[in-house]
Amino acid sequence: MTPRLSFHKYQGLGNDFILVDNRWQSQPCLSPEEAVALCNRRFGVGADGVIFLLPGQEGADFSMRLFNSDGSEAEMCGNGIRCLARFLQDLGIPGRDGAYQIHTLAGRIVPQVRADGLVTVDMGIPRLLAKQIPTTLVEPDEKVIRQPLAVAGREWRVTAVSMGNPHCVVFLEEEGSLEELDLAAVGPLFEHHPAFPERTNTEFVQVLSPTRLRLRVWERGAGATLACGTGACAVLVAAVLEERAESQATVELPGGNLEIRWDPSTQHVWMTGPALHVFSGTTAG
């Protein structure tokens, strides 16, 4: 049973999180097992993960930690950090021009709450070498672009990108195949494939045009979700690497759309999307 706890529920395109104000200590106030109980949609609050707002470190304003619904810890989460920025604003902490320097396990990330309520995030520079993903699909210092991967009795072509967390991107060539994909069956096979020693998030993508992509995602530690911010960023990067898309595109997810831009001059990836407060409460303890 989780201890008595004040919490705040937020969602970004249906990717939902329990936010905990944990600024009074440097470690999360819940164990991974307690986070699992809290995320349970029948016996707990229900969420894809628990996000802890922690004191800043290494010069950042604040720190963020995230336990997935299975108790594993994620290095970063694009939808989650947008929700954290909205949470900070709702706490009455304005930031500098609406921007916050957030320390994560993937490095420093800078979300900014815009005047129109959307949140734009500098997601940093994507990591493309196999050793940075990590994956054993190619040699450590090589990029993973359209490499063959055997899963569920067939060969898939995959491109791997790290946005601070690992992503395996699969472009589906046949019209209608995205909707017909049995994500619950194939997703775990990608996630736990031995070619990804730290497991992986997996995105299945249909290219609608050079500026519009549609995807479904299987998240490492959370399963099928309505949206994945780092996944949307990884998909655009992979689409550019495979010469399927321009450097700025709308990414359609089951929960809604994100605007993603890969700046050719700085190599930084920028994500813009919503983050909304759903409700606040206190657990019984």
Curated annotation (Swiss-Prot):
<comment type="subunit">
    <text>Homodimer.</text>
</comment>
<feature type="binding site">
    <location>
        <position position="201"/>
    </location>
    <ligand>
        <name>substrate</name>
    </ligand>
</feature>
<keyword id="KW-0413">Isomerase</keyword>
<feature type="active site" description="Proton donor">
    <location>
        <position position="77"/>
    </location>
</feature>
<dbReference type="Pfam" id="PF01678">
    <property type="entry name" value="DAP_epimerase"/>
</dbReference>
<keyword id="KW-0963">Cytoplasm</keyword>
<comment type="similarity">
    <text>Belongs to the diaminopimelate epimerase family.</text>
</comment>
<dbReference type="GO" id="GO:0005829">
    <property type="term" value="C:cytosol"/>
</dbReference>
<comment type="function">
    <text>Catalyzes the stereoinversion of LL-2,6-diaminopimelate (L,L-DAP) to meso-diaminopimelate (meso-DAP), a precursor of L-lysine and an essential component of the bacterial peptidoglycan.</text>
</comment>
<keyword id="KW-0028">Amino-acid biosynthesis</keyword>
<feature type="binding site">
    <location>
        <begin position="78"/>
        <end position="79"/>
    </location>
    <ligand>
        <name>substrate</name>
    </ligand>
</feature>
<keyword id="KW-0457">Lysine biosynthesis</keyword>
<dbReference type="GO" id="GO:0009089">
    <property type="term" value="P:lysine biosynthetic process via diaminopimelate"/>
</dbReference>
<feature type="site" description="Could be important to modulate the pK values of the two catalytic cysteine residues">
    <location>
        <position position="219"/>
    </location>
</feature>
<feature type="binding site">
    <location>
        <position position="68"/>
    </location>
    <ligand>
        <name>substrate</name>
    </ligand>
</feature>
<dbReference type="InterPro" id="IPR018510">
    <property type="entry name" value="DAP_epimerase_AS"/>
</dbReference>
<protein>
    <recommendedName>
        <fullName>Diaminopimelate epimerase</fullName>
        <ecNumber>5.1.1.7</ecNumber>
    </recommendedName>
</protein>
<dbReference type="GO" id="GO:0008837">
    <property type="term" value="F:diaminopimelate epimerase activity"/>
</dbReference>
<feature type="binding site">
    <location>
        <begin position="219"/>
        <end position="220"/>
    </location>
    <ligand>
        <name>substrate</name>
    </ligand>
</feature>
<feature type="active site" description="Proton acceptor">
    <location>
        <position position="228"/>
    </location>
</feature>
<feature type="site" description="Could be important to modulate the pK values of the two catalytic cysteine residues">
    <location>
        <position position="167"/>
    </location>
</feature>
<feature type="binding site">
    <location>
        <position position="165"/>
    </location>
    <ligand>
        <name>substrate</name>
    </ligand>
</feature>
<feature type="binding site">
    <location>
        <begin position="229"/>
        <end position="230"/>
    </location>
    <ligand>
        <name>substrate</name>
    </ligand>
</feature>
<dbReference type="InterPro" id="IPR001653">
    <property type="entry name" value="DAP_epimerase_DapF"/>
</dbReference>
<comment type="pathway">
    <text>Amino-acid biosynthesis; L-lysine biosynthesis via DAP pathway; DL-2,6-diaminopimelate from LL-2,6-diaminopimelate: step 1/1.</text>
</comment>
<feature type="binding site">
    <location>
        <position position="15"/>
    </location>
    <ligand>
        <name>substrate</name>
    </ligand>
</feature>
